[in-house]
């Protein structure tokens, strides 16, 4: 049962020395460190040891979304060339997108932005996201997607101080379905060679898609976390993936979610109590008191203080245990956030394991 403190936003705070924020990914990717968490222990390993840390028959479920070049730089028309940043969030139609804009105060409905050869007009203000609905003036039959690789940049988290030499470093090696505005970072540690070693040990994998959206960037503001709401994100769990998961469970294997996005996608698809194919939007918000329906263990990075991701992990292992593990990680010089190290939360560590 959750403790009343588990619903307090302040109870998810911790102090992280700035030098523990990873500014660059390690190379090779699977040389990152891995804290392996069981019911009673937290052991130090490396990610390339994952095949030996799981059991034959276990099934890894991964998110194959790809980060789009969502950051556009333009000029406000008629404002002496004022620079404008447009951060695309979601395609609403062939011509319209939901976006965050800077400077927001100067971009009211009717404002026109020149982005390369394209003009875009602010239509409305979206109250939920504080963003703008923007309509792009495109040639007939065109969609903005065909312009993004030329006009856009892959957005990096705000705590990353320097651009990457190669933006593929912020994509998983299996990213194939464009649509995310942030990477599913638990998957950044995998390499083709690691997948081969996992297969040799009898550990298979399958994919789903969840396009990571604005919720990644929005801090929790409600003092009582139960009053927080996540922005909807599009996801798909295919019939083939459902069959793979059901077969693995029937054979005695464990379902290991790679990242919090996979947890939310699977739990959405199992909302009826039985995992079923799902294609649509979800705003599932997991925090202490939630009873998982399908996920048994998972891999996740170390998350920002007071974030909904900390609350999700706490729903599985408890808030106090999570904060203890984070302090141990700081003491042991682990690297935090998107390019940082990871945790493998084994089923025995989850107090509400299925």
UniProtKB/Swiss-Prot annotation:
Enzyme class, UniProt record, top EC level: transferase
Keyword entries, A-Z: Cytoplasm, Queuosine biosynthesis, S-adenosyl-L-methionine, Transferase
HAMAP family per UniProt: QueA (MF_00113)
Compartments where found: Cytoplasm
Catalytic activity line of the entry: 7-aminomethyl-7-carbaguanosine(34) in tRNA + S-adenosyl-L-methionine = epoxyqueuosine(34) in tRNA + adenine + L-methionine + 2 H(+)
A GO biological process held by the record: queuosine biosynthetic process
Species for this entry: Thermosynechococcus vestitus (strain NIES-2133 / IAM M-273 / BP-1)
Pathway where it operates: tRNA modification; tRNA-queuosine biosynthesis
Alphabetized PANTHER family for the sequence: S-ADENOSYLMETHIONINE:TRNA RIBOSYLTRANSFERASE-ISOMERASE
Any one Gene Ontology cellular component term annotated for this protein: cytoplasm
Protein's UniProt keywords contain Cytoplasm: yes
Job description of the protein: Transfers and isomerizes the ribose moiety from AdoMet to the 7-aminomethyl group of 7-deazaguanine (preQ1-tRNA) to give epoxyqueuosine (oQ-tRNA).
Lineage: superkingdom: Bacteria
Listed name of the protein: S-adenosylmethionine:tRNA ribosyltransferase-isomerase
Family per similarity comment: Belongs to the QueA family.
A molecular function GO annotation: S-adenosylmethionine:tRNA ribosyltransferase-isomerase activity
Documented EC number(s): 2.4.99.17
Upper taxonomic lineage: Bacteria, Bacillati, Cyanobacteriota, Cyanophyceae, Acaryochloridales
Gene3D superfamilies xref list: QueA-like
Gene: queA
Quaternary context: Monomer.
